[in-house]
Curated annotation (Swiss-Prot):
This is Beta-ketoacyl-[acyl-carrier-protein] synthase III. GO terms for molecular function: 3-oxoacyl-[acyl-carrier-protein] synthase activity; beta-ketoacyl-acyl-carrier-protein synthase III activity. It comes from the Bacteria. The keyword Transport does not apply. Gene3D superfamilies: 3.40.47.10. GO terms for cellular component: cytoplasm. One of its GO terms (biological process) is fatty acid biosynthetic process. The keyword Lipid metabolism applies. It catalyses: malonyl-[ACP] + acetyl-CoA + H(+) = 3-oxobutanoyl-[ACP] + CO2 + CoA. Its main location: cytoplasm.
Length: 334
């Protein structure tokens, strides 16, 4: 059977930085309060760029690092909860056009909120193993500043903009070992952007009620996330006869330091195994895991052959875990 490998990784963040001290001037909050509750010190905000721009810049670097020519990419899948356009075209199609791959390539979006990158891995893994595709570009890209209410201190402190991209290719080494994804739509109201879809079409009323922004029941989400992520990781480790000691790096979705620490302690991961970027990027939803992997890769921590365990939980609710060997035969070395 064909194997699928993550053969390149890249990320992009916009230049503007919004610090906690900047937010102190906008809402009733403080740097101390934000850091204590979330672990976030700053986040990047896109000005003059849209989601497809962010995704394109990460994608270009991922393709370069993979040593591939653009025509060798046969599929682009983008995970985003802040697409360029509500209905169409897909952000993936616009990224394809930006890359000059504007005819004949398979391109589509998925919506799995903060679990988006793990869903992307599962799709790409299946396409490669089935023989349907050879080189799949997966992109998690978010301009969350466009869907955040900067008068709501419970949410505006959390989110940032950015993109991460990876190439998944057919390979005989460093394979994606296992992926688990799941969902529970019965609790979707706890983390939701209510407006601008068919449930509450855009109107003066929905805009006045700020239904076009992210709404979150933070305490409930925290409890469910910790329980669900812990169970998800335990299941995937047991399914593969592994423990936390078989993992080189634990790369969680960067949502909130308290969630990460709670899950880490329950799973017995050591500090040196954990990849954390939340302090400088905040929560970038579907982009957070590839951005974190790329940071650890560029700093020399994650290397070709490293065993990674990824986990994420997001709106929907969606969640998932993945175990993979990082890199491949032609992996780009910094």
């Amino acid at each position: 059977m064909l194997k699928a490998s993550l053969i390149s990784i890249a990320s992009y963040v916009p230049e503007k930085i919004l610090t906690n001290f900047d937010l102190e001037k906008m809402v009733d909050t403080s740097d101390e309060w934000i850091v204590k509750r979330t672990g976030i010190k700053e986040r990047h905000i896109a000005e003059g760029e849209i989601t497809s721009d962010l995704g394109t810049k990460a994608a270009k670097l991922a393709i370069k690092r993979a040593g591939l020519e653009k025509p060798q990419i046969d599929t682009i899948i983008c995970a985003t909860m802040s697409p360029d356009h509500l209905c169409m075209p897909s952000t993936a199609c616009k990224i394809a056009a930006n890359l000059g791959l504007d005819y004949g390539i398979t391109a589509f979006d998925i919506s799995a909120a903060c679990t988006g990158f793990i869903y992307l891995l599962q799709l790409a893994n299946s396409l490669i193993k089935s023989g349907a595709k050879k080189n799949v570009l997966i992109v998690g890209a978010e301009k969350l500043s466009s869907v955040v209410d900067y008068t709501d201190r419970s949410t505006c402190i959390l989110f940032g903009d950015g993109a991460g991209a990876a190439i998944i290719s057919a390979s005989n080494e460093n394979e994606i070992i296992d992926i688990h994804t799941a969902s529970d739509g019965t609790q979707s109201h706890l983390l939701i952007t209510p407006g601008c879809g068919s449930a509450y079409p855009a109107s003066d009323e929905t805009l006045a009620k700020r239904l076009n922004f992210i709404h979150m029941s933070g305490n409930e989400v925290f409890k469910i996330a910790v329980q669900t992520l812990t169970k998800s990781v335990i299941e995937i480790l047991e399914r593969n006869n592994m423990t936390s000691r078989d993992i080189d790096f634990f790369v969680p979705h960067q949502a909130n330091i308290r969630i990460i620490e709670a899950v880490k302690q329950r799973l017995d991961f050591k500090d040196e195994q954990c990849v954390l970027t939340i302090a400088k990027y905040g929560n970038t939803s579907s982009a957070s895991i590839p951005m974190a992997i790329n940071d650890a890769y560029e700093s020399g921590r994650i290397k070709n052959g490293s065993t990674l365990l990824l986990d994420a939980f997001g709106g929907g609710f969606t969640w998932g875990s993945a175990i993979l060997k990082f890199g491949g035969k032609n992996f780009y070395q910094i």
